[in-house]
Amino acid sequence: MTTLTLNTSLLSSCRILAAFSGGLDSTVLLHQLVLWRERHPDVTLRAIHIHHGLSPHADSWVRHCETVCERWQVPLVVERVTLADNGLGIEAHAREARYRAFAQTLLPGEVLATAQHLDDQCETFLLALKRGSGPAGLSAMGERSPFAGTLLLRPLLRETRKTLEQWAVRHGLCWIEDESNQDDAYDRNFLRLRALPLLQQRWPHFPAAVARSATLCAEQERLLDELLASDLTDCITAEGTLRLSPLMSMSDVRRAAILRRWLAMRNAPMPSRDALERIWQEVALARDDASPCLRFGDREIRRYQSQLWWIKSVAGQHETTVAWPVWQTPLALPAGLGTVQLVPGGELRRPREEESVSIRFKAPGVLHIVGRNGGRKLKKIWQEQGIPPWRRDTTPLLFYGETLIAAAGVFVTREGAAEDKEGVSLVWHA
């Protein structure tokens, strides 16, 4: 193996963040990138090590990575993550936390490089096959993928684990061995330790053949993207919701493909066939007077005004009152609803000295809003303004004392209208 086996065509960026666990694969990747940097002095290289806290050896692994990076003059970032039981399983949760840390560490203009190789690609394909995935899932990993507003690169994806080990031995590299890699209770370890050696003994080029199949699946998926682009444009609104009327006349297969692509655009996890069927039957085709909702982890799919919405699950806040004693500073809202602030210049009057300021999520009685004749209850205003039901008890309502002044981004009451040019605006950062 020479430095040329690193897929340098991917390395157009001069700023690289390498994921570095200290294991064999990432050690070879970092070594290759250090050699690449020697040949290209304009390259800026950093490494990141994730301390999961799962192994009693985790602290010693950090010290090992620090030693390696100091020797190779690579700045190292160590991120400690906390893993809580979220129902995903420890493998999936650790991966989620790891990539979240990567995203938070990346600097502007920097790309992430990870050390997946051909055997990893084979394992990923087989795991997707076990789950009954279609072409999208069987595409496995690409050498270049969008990630956190930049790119995730896998420059070693064409190399086998055996080739990486030969390189490491030839160059006297030291690496750590994670004891959990020998536990075949984990699906990926089972494939690596038991299934793949047997398959490769029978068919030595099995991983390469699987990688070709993954590439063909990826090509088919890209072709579908091209063929369905026009349909997708017709179905998706400016808000990112999915219009149902065009889907009604589509075949089941075409409609499912559109649903998958819409969910992918919303960064949703890839749905199973059963999940797609439930979305269509239980949400899209629910009776007209229903407010259907299907939960997916901390997200929901809802229907409103003949459109499907992919939204974050938020508990209703209609009984919540948040005091705002210093209204000149931003106020944090509960339930992850963001912040609100009153900024100079706007159509709201400032609170009088004797008026307390608060944020609430319900308002009783008949309300009179600017630009409308007569009074109406809040429920009627929500309906007239086209506010979806799930936003009606999570939209901040500004009160001065017991008087409703405004609903963030929706309306201003007559009692809240500015009386002079010294008004303010209610800004909601959701």
From Swiss-Prot:
Subcellular location: Cytoplasm
Enzyme Commission identifier(s): 6.3.4.19
Pfam families linked to this entry: ATP_bind_3, TilS, TilS_C
Keyword terms of this UniProt record: ATP-binding, Cytoplasm, Ligase, Nucleotide-binding, tRNA processing
Catalytic activity: cytidine(34) in tRNA(Ile2) + L-lysine + ATP = lysidine(34) in tRNA(Ile2) + AMP + diphosphate + H(+)
Any GO BP annotation: tRNA modification
Residues engaged in binding ATP: 21-26
A GO cellular-component term linked to this record: cytoplasm
Gene Ontology terms for molecular function: ATP binding; tRNA(Ile)-lysidine synthase activity
Function (record text): Ligates lysine onto the cytidine present at position 34 of the AUA codon-specific tRNA(Ile) that contains the anticodon CAU, in an ATP-dependent manner. Cytidine is converted to lysidine, thus changing the amino acid specificity of the tRNA from methionine to isoleucine.
Record's comment describing the protein's domains: The N-terminal region contains the highly conserved SGGXDS motif, predicted to be a P-loop motif involved in ATP binding.
Family under the similarity heading: Belongs to the tRNA(Ile)-lysidine synthase family.
NCBIfam families tied to this protein: lysidine_TilS_C, lysidine_TilS_N, PRK10660.1
Protein name, UniProt field: tRNA(Ile)-lysidine synthase
Taxonomic lineage: Bacteria, Pseudomonadati, Pseudomonadota, Gammaproteobacteria, Enterobacterales
Gene name per UniProt: tilS
